[in-house]
Design a protein with these regions (language model features):
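Glycine-rich, flexible N-terminal cofactor/catalytic loop recognition
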Residues: 1-42
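Glycine-rich His-Gly loop
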Residues: 28-29, 50, 89
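Short catalytic/ligand-binding loop motif for oxyanion handling, primarily in non-cytosolic enzymes
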Residues: 33-34, 56, 92-96
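Long, contiguous secondary-structure blocks with strong helical propensity
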Residues: 36-50, 157
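Helix-loop module immediately N-terminal to the HCX5R catalytic loop
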Residues: 46-84
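Amphipathic alpha-helical interface surfaces
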Residues: 67-71, 93, 97-98, 114, ...
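Catalytic cysteine-centered active loop of the rhodanese-like fold, especially the PTP/DSP P-loop
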Residues: 75-105
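PTP/DSP superfamily signal
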Residues: 78-80, 103-161
């Protein structure tokens, strides 16, 4: 069973009633000036700080496997609870992290179903290519998750967003 996942922009997350979620994954740019932080009350929040890039650029922070692993561990802790995953635009990084969580929950052999669920959650998904490749490796999907994702939707191969 997959967790209830919602993907949004940073602005939408700022305006949302976050208390309705069991967990919030905040993915922020390395140069964010006003980060979104939860107060001490539920839900729990995981903050990941990296930029929407696929190769090294100046002082920007590249996505790394540890970001995916931390998100997967956080989602495991939430279990079948509800998750809000947001990044600045709600398109690339949050979609890729959402896909990693869905694919892990569904298990091997369910890669196409994982991508289809992501499409239903966020029809505007353009997952970060680097994150999808790393997820495929972490979950030992032998490029199947990456291929299914790239066949069904566009992947961002951004220089910087």
């Amino acid at each position: 069973m997959t967790p209830s996942i919602q993907i949004s922009t940073l602005d939408a997350a700022r305006e949302a009633d976050l208390s309705i979620y069991d967990g919030v994954i905040t993915i922020e740019n390395s140069n964010i000036e006003t980060p979104l932080r939860m107060d001490s009350s539920p839900p729990e929040q995981l903050v990941l700080r990296f930029d929407d890039i696929c190769e090294p650029i100046d002082d920007f922070i590249e996505p790394q496997e540890i970001h995916i692993q931390r998100a997967l561990t956080f989602a495991d802790k939430i279990g079948d609870g509800s998750l809000l995953i947001h990044c600045h635009a709600g398109i690339s990084r949050s979609s890729a992290i959402g896909l990693s969580i869905i694919a892990k929950k569904l298990g091997k052999g369910k890669e196409l179903e994982s991508v289809e669920i992501l499409e239903k959650i966020n029809p505007y998904s353009y997952p970060n290519k680097s994150l999808v490749l790393m997820t495929d490796d972490i979950l030992e999907r032998n490029m199947i998750l990456y291929k299914m994702t790239s066949d069904k939707m566009s992947l961002t191969d951004t220089r910087i967003l």
